[in-house]
């Protein structure tokens, strides 16, 4: 199909986003081209600004525009409990429950030997470093209930258990193979409430 070169490039760039195939990219491209120029410029500016200003929190590895992030800097949170999640969007899902008042640690992935993702590719060393001061009493493993998430949780549990920290895993109730970000707040709250020691 023939497109003007700028349209073809826009479609190609949009397909680099997760979940955006060629047809969706084409629809988005034509929609963008029909938008007011000021709106398109605003979106472009916001993308560039977010990419430039958002970084990793030096404590929990979550995405933030301040360091430490708002959660880590909050003295009202329970800093003796760390909830370990795979992705930043999982922090958002857990916060929506309004049941968890501790702090987080974001791994930015899960172990997946088939895809070459090993322990050095996720933020486990940073987690272990946080446990060194004796302040943390419990680590709640909230990785996704799929093969990669379960493998990651078991590895982390075995790795940090000798440090004398209580290690728990969120309860079932989340569908096997699902992602935390898609679970509703009530299910997540119940899974957190029913966590078990491993």
UniProtKB/Swiss-Prot annotation:
Q: What CDD domains does the annotation carry?
A: TOPRIM_recR
Instruction: Report domain Toprim positions.
Output: 80-175
Give start-end positions of each zinc finger (C4-type): 57-72
Q: Which GO terms describe its molecular function?
A: DNA binding; zinc ion binding
UniProt keyword Magnesium present: no
Q: Which UniProt keywords apply?
A: DNA damage, DNA recombination, DNA repair, Metal-binding, Zinc, Zinc-finger
Q: What does this protein do?
A: May play a role in DNA repair. It seems to be involved in an RecBC-independent recombinational process of DNA repair. It may act with RecF and RecO.
State the similarity comment: Belongs to the RecR family.
Q: What is this protein called?
A: Recombination protein RecR
Query: What lineage is this protein's organism placed in?
Result: Bacteria, Bacillati, Bacillota, Clostridia, Eubacteriales
